[in-house]
Amino acid sequence: MNQMNPAFVMPDVQSTVDTRQIPIQRVGVKAVRHPLTVLTESGDVQPTVGVWNLDVRLPAEQKGTHMSRFVALLEENRAPLTIERFRAMIASMLEKLEAEAGRIEVTFPYFVNKTAPVSGVQSLLDYEVTLAGESRNGDTRLFLKVLVPVTSLCPCSKKISQYGAHNQRSHVTIDAELAADVPVEALIRIAEEEASCELWGLLKRPDEKFVTERAYENPKFVEDLVRDVAARLDADARIVAYVLEAENFESIHNHSAYALIERDKRHAA
């Protein structure tokens, strides 16, 4: 059996000088699945699983980054994730990797316990959430993205039909740049309140009647949906910029209806 010479110094290849002198904007690890806990709006701790992407900028003269340090960062951060802890993670990553710029992104399922509108039965509904942050030149920007499933009902179908109207499930995706902490539930509420109707995991017959009639009384085109949500985001000072999408999975077509609004309040006229 070979034994390592105590005097042997293991070479640090990635720290050597690269003669090609080409900088790399982003290098790191992608799709790292790792346990995660998050704080809910009520202060409860919710366990989930995050899919992480972590990267830094690599100078032209440096051959490689320290890949193991990205995973080590996740191992060191087991406390429930908050906006401030996430900001601190970015700063810690830059320090560990001796980098001037970097980015962290984590996507995870987030569950909300919802109460049916009539029967009062409770059930969980899942939402896809992404928290992202990037730092460069000492400036850190934070982004919260939420995909919210809702119901939409067509105003034209209601207007021209003797009875009924076509309706479908829709996705509202809000990708907001934050100036202050915004709970995930706050963005979910905005999307659900501006849709024809929200969704629940479990409904009894009286609830189904309510949902059907609620959507019928609140018809919206995909254009209406994004504009109404955008108005709510415009009024929220905690959000400085956003990309907002709505997609209706049309029940009478084999395609979707789609709309997007992008706005940066810092550059608004």
Swiss-Prot record:
Protein EC: 3.5.4.16
Top-level lineage group: Bacteria
InterPro entries hit by this protein: GTP_cyclohydrolase_FolE2, GTP_cyclohydrolase_FolE2/MptA
Catalytic activity line of the entry: GTP + H2O = 7,8-dihydroneopterin 3'-triphosphate + formate + H(+)
Molecular functions (GO terms): GTP cyclohydrolase I activity
Keyword Hydrolase carried by entry: yes
Site (May be catalytically important): 154
Any GO BP annotation: tetrahydrofolate biosynthetic process
Keyword Hydrolase: yes
Keyword annotations of the record: Hydrolase
Associated pathway: Cofactor biosynthesis; 7,8-dihydroneopterin triphosphate biosynthesis; 7,8-dihydroneopterin triphosphate from GTP: step 1/1
Pfam families reported for this sequence: GCHY-1
Assigned protein family: Belongs to the GTP cyclohydrolase IV family.
Function: Converts GTP to 7,8-dihydroneopterin triphosphate.
Entry-linked PANTHER family: GTP CYCLOHYDROLASE MPTA
Protein name, per record: GTP cyclohydrolase FolE2
Organism placement in taxonomy: Bacteria, Pseudomonadati, Pseudomonadota, Betaproteobacteria, Burkholderiales
